[in-house]
Regions:
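Bacterial N-terminal signal peptides
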Residues: 5-15
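Active-site loop/oxyanion-hole signature of alpha/beta-hydrolase fold enzymes
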Residues: 22-25, 67-108, 112, 116, ...
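Conserved HGGG/HGGXW glycine-rich cap/lid loop of the alpha/beta-hydrolase fold
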Residues: 25, 31-78
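Conserved catalytic-core motifs of eukaryotic protein kinase domains, centered on the activation segment
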Residues: 51-53, 76-82, 143-144, 228-229
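Flexible "cap/lid" loop of the alpha/beta hydrolase fold
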Residues: 118-123, 127-159
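Conserved alpha/beta-hydrolase catalytic His-Asp/Glu region
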Residues: 142-145, 152-212
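Conserved loop-alpha-helix segment in the C-terminal half of the alpha/beta-hydrolase fold
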Residues: 214-253
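Post-His helix in hydrolase/transferase enzymes
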Residues: 253-268
């Protein structure tokens, strides 16, 4: 139960909860640690800031670490009209950055959090020192354009969500960790599951633009075909990628020490 010991340890490190605001919605975040670099950790679809429980204690020894709940997730407010978008998510992250009075930040995004941090870099390039994607696409041009998510409404929709989540595990994913992830993701409201999924289908995310800051993608061991480096570097010229063998989609939970070392090595090379 390694992940549980990490969660317990996280309470030893001083943390401060904050609430920023975007479009009248309260955006929850937690700040831990201090240091020359500020890392903002952005969770994935129907997840919340607890996704990063295995990162915060280790990274906060060296950096200021901010975990955020995106709109409609965790303890953050949801849009009353049910309209979610990558712009809304990116602006929520910016509200958190501004509230924290951080100048430049390193953004770490898991799964759906990867296109969120890319969109943030489009909207607020002067605020970004670097990007780290965790088993998620920074270049949505390479994301399957014909992807059709299953219906997510009603009891059958909940079953579909559970099936999607279980497909993210490997036989080596500890059962207690599987249950933790299932509980976290299935408690997200139906409107959030539908709206956040729809936000990833926006054709505007596939535009040919350049994001010049350093970027690292860390892929799960189950990712069978990594993005084409030459094509990706047309959009992200300072893009690098690596893979963590023996992991599923939640690789930062499954092999936290290895993942944390990759983060530190990347951040320590950045200019602030």
């Amino acid at each position: 139960m390694r992940w549980l010991s990490v969660v317990v340890l996280s309470f030893v490190v001083a943390a401060t909860a904050s609430a920023a605001s975007v479009d009248g919605l309260n955006i929850h975040s937690t700040t831990t640690g201090a240091g020359p670099a500020t890392l903002v950790l952005v969770h994935g679809w129907t997840c919340d800031e607890s996704s990063w429980a295995a990162q915060v204690p280790a990274l906060a020894k060296k950096y200021r670490v901010i975990t955020v709940d995106l709109p409609g997730h965790g303890r953050s407010g949801a849009p009353a009209n049910g309209k979610f978008s990558m712009d809304l998510f990116a602006r929520a992250v910016e509200a958190v950055r501004a509230e924290a009075r951080a100048d430049k930040i390193v953004l770490v995004g898991h799964s759906m959090g990867a296109p969120v941090i890319r969109q943030y870099a489009r909207l607020y390039p002067a605020r970004v020192a670097g990007l780290i994607a965790v088993d998620g696409p920074l270049d949505m041009r390479q994301f399957p354009g014909d992807f059709k998510p299953p219906a997510l409404t009603g009891p059958e929709g909940l079953k579909a969500r559970e099936g999607m989540i279980r497909s993210m595990f490997t036989p080596q994913t500890p059962p207690d960790l599987q249950q933790k992830i299932l509980t976290m993701m299935l408690k997200a409201p139906e409107a959030t599951a539908i709206g956040a999924m729809g936000s990833m289908m926006d054709p505007a995310l596939r535009k040919d633009d350049v994001t010049p800051m350093p970027a690292l993608a860390v892929w799960a061991g189950t990712s069978q075909q990594l993005p084409n480096l030459e094509d990706t570097r047309k959009a992200l010229p300072k893009y690098e990628q690596t893979q963590v063998p023996g992991t599923g989609h939640f690789l930062m939970m499954e092999k936290p020490d290895e993942f944390n070392r990759l983060v530190v090595a990347f951040v320590d090379k950045l200019q602030f």
